[in-house]
Design a protein with these regions (language model features):
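C-terminal motif of bacterial Sec signal peptides marking the signal peptidase cleavage site
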Residues: 19-22
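Beta-alpha junction/loop-to-helix N-cap segments that form part of ligand/metal-binding clefts
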Residues: 30-32, 59-61, 71-149, 212-217, ...
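Extracellular/periplasmic Venus flytrap/periplasmic-binding protein
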Residues: 97, 142-143, 150-252, 288-292
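Bacterial signal peptide processing site
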Residues: 24-27
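Extracellular/periplasmic periplasmic-binding protein-like sensory domains
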Residues: 245-314, 324, 368, 372-374
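Segments of small-molecule ligand-sensing domains
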Residues: 304-310, 321-371
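Periplasmic-binding protein-like
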Residues: 46, 102-115, 135-137, 178-183, ...
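Extracytoplasmic "Venus flytrap"
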Residues: 32-66, 84-93, 115-116, 182-190, ...
Length: 379
């Protein structure tokens, strides 16, 4: 099977359920990505957290990218690619230093990531200046595509898409009348919370800001319980969200609790405890993993279950790898490939409009029985 044909087949089959075994071989026929035409040592990079408080989200994405890489290498044995991981720990300053290393390594022709909005903003100028294409699975700050960068792309909807849907769910499904909105002061958390505030209008009964790595939320808990709120929205990440809901429930709060994709992780339940976490609503522009993808993911990642943005990690990597399969070996050629990408992915149809993906779906996941249950689209 010719390599070009193989990658087109992979993309179609992935969207249908990741039944990829039929595409696991290539012939020795000459193609754009075979033999001496393929440079040796081609690499893609992953940039995102692998350690630290928010490592789970980064690991989910890099593991998803591993599945795409495995599929690619099985189908393209004549032009194998490796992925080098760069651990930002979710820190924009660390990500900036790592971006310099990535740019200086000329064997790296594309980047899966950055994973977080803050580090995406911090590294955008550098990657754009180097002409090195990046495809993020999870950076949702709407402002990231307003800087004129031609290299930044994402395969997920933005907070500008998610926040109105979150507000709609709070009003129409939770039927809340008084909502207390809290954010973690991060670029991501405040941006999402501000969008929810706007969508809720006069239903907002109170606001507060906390900090990342904060563990004592007693002052905020007092404000919430004193406000008479029947719902709380939190913009931030799972470590603090779990502690916040735990302390709210301990103080007698009986209302609903909602947070966004930064909290959609088993770490939320671990921090909160199952009893406190049960009933929480966690929204995300990320699709639930299919059974077929879950099987492949576990096989490629030592039995680990796919998590938030794992499937999007697959899609982000596959956007880049499919270009390599078509003989796009230089940074310039891959950038052009991604800018004009228009194919079905695992999670959605992927086509970019100035870096933003065209297809937008927001899912609501509910915690029940001490687990995050499969999400359903917010209508």
């Amino acid at each position: 099977m010719h390599t070009k044909h193989t990658l087109r087949t992979l993309a179609v089959v992935a969207a249908a359920g990741l039944a990829l075994t039929a595409c696991g071989t290539t012939s020795s026929s000459s193609t754009a990505s075979s033999g001496s035409n393929c440079p040796s040592g081609l690499k893609i990079a992953f940039l995102g957290a692998q350690t630290g408080d928010y490592a789970n989200l980064g690991i989910n994405i890099s593991n998803g990218a591993n599945v795409a890489l495995d599929d690619y290498n099985k189908a393209n044995s004549d032009c194998k690619v490796t992925m080098q991981k760069f651990d930002s720990q979710g820190d924009p300053n660390q990500a900036t230093k790592l971006a310099t290393q990535i740019i200086q390594d000329k064997s790296i022709v594309g980047v899966v990531g950055p994973a977080f909005s803050g580090e995406s903003g911090a590294t955008g100028d550098a990657f754009n200046g180097a002409g090195l294409v990046t495809v993020s699975a999870s950076a949702t700050d709407p402002a990231l595509t307003t800087h004129g960068w031609t290299t930044f792309h994402r395969v997920v909807a933005t907070d500008a898409d998610q926040a109105p849907q979150d507000a709609k769910y709070i009003k129409d499904t939770l039927n809340a009348k008084k909502v207390f909105v809290i954010d973690d002061s991060s670029e991501y958390g405040k941006g999402l919370a501000d969008g929810v505030r706007k969508g809720l209008g006069n239903l907002v009964t109170g606001n507060d800001a906390v900090q990342q790595k904060q563990t004592d939320f007693s002052a905020t808990v007092t404000k919430v319980t004193s406000s008479g709120a029947d719902a709380v929205f939190y913009g931030g990440y799972y470590a603090e969200a779990g502690l916040l809901i735990k302390q709210l429930k301990a103080a007698g709060y009986k209302g609903a609790f909602m947070s966004g994709d930064g909290s959609l992780d088993p770490g939320f339940i671990q921090a909160a405890g199952a009893d406190a976490a049960n009933g929480a609503i966690l929204t995300c522009p990320c699709a639930p993993s299919s059974a077929d993808f879950t099987t492949k993911y576990k096989a490629d990642n030592s039995g680990a279950e796919p998590g938030t943005y794992s499937a999007e990690g697959y899609d982000a990597a596959n956007v880049i790898l499919s270009g390599i399969a078509e003989g796009k070996y230089t940074r310039a050629d891959l950038l052009d490939w991604v800018n004009n990408y228009d194919q079905d992915g695992l999670t959605k149809h992927i086509k970019f409009n100035k870096g933003d993906v065209s297809t937008v779906v927001i899912y609501a996941y509910k915690v029940g029985g001490g687990k995050i249950q499969p999400g359903t689209p917010i209508k």
